[in-house]
Each structure stands twice: as structure tokens, then as C-alpha cells.
Amino acid sequence: MNVIDLRSDTVTQPTPAMREAMASAPVGDDVYGEDPTINELQALAAEMLGKEAGLFVASGTMGNLTSVLTHCGRGEEMILGKQAHIFRYEAGSAAAYGGVHPNTLQVQPDGTLDLDEIRQTIRPDNEHHPVTRLICLENTQGGVMGAPLPVSYMRQVGEIAREHGLKLHVDGARLFNAAAALGVTARELVEDADSASICLSKGLCAPVGSVIVGSRDFIKRAHRIRKSLGGGMRQAGILGAAGLIALREMSRPERLSEDHANARSLAEGLAALPYITLDLSTVRTNMFKFWLAADAPITAEGLMHALEADYGILIRPYSLDERSFRLVTHFYIQAEQVRKVVSAIGELLGAHEHAVAG
């Protein structure tokens, strides 16, 4: 049974081209700056995002943490969303390792932070308050199911940051998904950012790694932070080779738009089933959430286990208490897999019997 894994786009496997490139990659000691493949990857990422330099890191969490600690000192503050990955899913690392205080705002349904709230949250020059240093945005915003933040909004936040002498960091784990959905370049989306991180191992299919980009001075300082976090790697070009293919081939808008179309198709199929509630207006990129009715013939936990045991389909509960699930499409979810998932969930919910009875 071939597994259909919809838990996340982090489950993607390296493509055959990536595996071949990894096997023959030129390598060197990256701590000495001598790995030619990593140097090429960093330069490519910087060029694609319109920045001066890049730095390869082991994960998105390390990339965000390195960026935050490069921008902020101990006791200083960053403004970000309550639903931001940095705040919710990175183990409080900025506070734990850097003493950086998070000041959180509610993320709007479209993934943005309210501009007036951002302005009002910036601290006055007062000894009783931490010093505001940084604004963090996430694009796409995973906390509201992959909402892409448009260029116009990114520019407005950049203007606010500059007006107040702050820095802007963009967690762009799925930045190329945002670019594909909006019909713009990734470079345009981070033009006003002082730093950005992009993940290579989600929808882009590389096995490991992220790249952070910024000015040469920022990256020079980030090198030291990365080292202090244990992120210096030796012959990392084996990983960088896959990253180069991720950026050159898998980040293309036409490639990622397929994932978005499959997410839309899957959502529409599920929305037509009984006992499922799903807001199609929230299906904007490659992920969405659905709810299972309380009177469904199977519990949320039962649905999850039956799909795995009987159909080889893996899904992830967003909240079992709320009977909700998040589904994420990626390179290994195509039209055939979409049809199988809709059919399997329909069978478990008794869709045919429900239609006959109706």
C-alpha cells in the first residue's frame, strides 16, 4: 500500500535528481567557508531574494532564531503574531537563548497584523519598557492555513519599521508558495525586509535545511550566532546540492501552483461530503482545515486511525477536541491521491448511504 501523507509538506522525500546531486556534490569545510556547494546555494538564495548574502542553517527554527538573535539583544522586544510559528512552535527559543521578549498581536483572517496595532505596540522610550527592535511577519501565514501576504502589505509594514528605526524579519518558510499564489516574485515579497528565512525541506522537497538572507553585515553577525547554536557544519554540500535543486526547480510558480490546485480540488471534494464543514474561501495555497460534525458516524480519532489502517492515508488532527484536521498538499499529492482521499473519507462517513437516505 502506497502511503498518502497529508500531515504536512515536511514529509516530502528528496527527488531522484536531488539524490543524484547529493551523491556527487563537491564539498569542503563550511565552517571555514570552503564548501563550494554551500557557497553556491547561499549566493543563489540571496540573488533570488534580492539580498546581499545568505547563510545555510539546519532548520527553519534555527534560521528564525539566528535572525532574531542577530537583530535583538537581551531584554529587547519583537512584535509578532500570536499564531506565528516563531511564537507558537519554536519552543520559546528566542526567550530561552536570547532573552528576547515577544509582544504578540492577533493575526487577522487574511494572515496580516493590523497596521494600527503594530504602530500602537511599538514601545515609547521609557525605562519601564523593553526596547522594541524587531517586527516579524510570516508569509505564508501557517496559523491561518497558508494565507499569502501581498506585496503592498509587506511594504506598509516595512515603512512602519523604518519610521521607528526597527528591523523587519520575514519567516518565509513557504515564501515561494506565497509568490506563486499572488503571481509575484519572492524577491518582491521581501524587498522591504532586513532579513528573511526560506525553508528548503517543505514543499521544495530537500531533505534538510533553510537559508537566511540579508545584508553582508547581518549575515556576518549571523555566522557567529549560528556557531553558538551548534549550527556550524563541515561537508554540508551534500545537503546544499539538494537545496540548489529545490531553489532552481521546485520553487517555480508553475510547480507550486499544482500543489495549490490539488489542495483546492481536495477541499471541494471533502466539502461535498456529509458531516464535514469546510470554508472554501480559506483554501489559498497548499493547506486547509476541516471540521467533523459531532453526530458523524465516526469520531475524529477514529477517522484518523481508520484512514491509516485501512487506506494508508495519514492526516493530522488540528484539534481533536474541536474535531478539526489540517491537510497539506505537496509534490507527492497528485490528482490520483486526491480522488483516493475523498473516496476513503466518504466511505468512512457513509456518504453513499447518506445520499440514498436523503
Predicted regions and their residues:
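Conserved PLP-enzyme active-site core in the AAT-like
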Residues: 1-310, 317-333, 337, 341-358
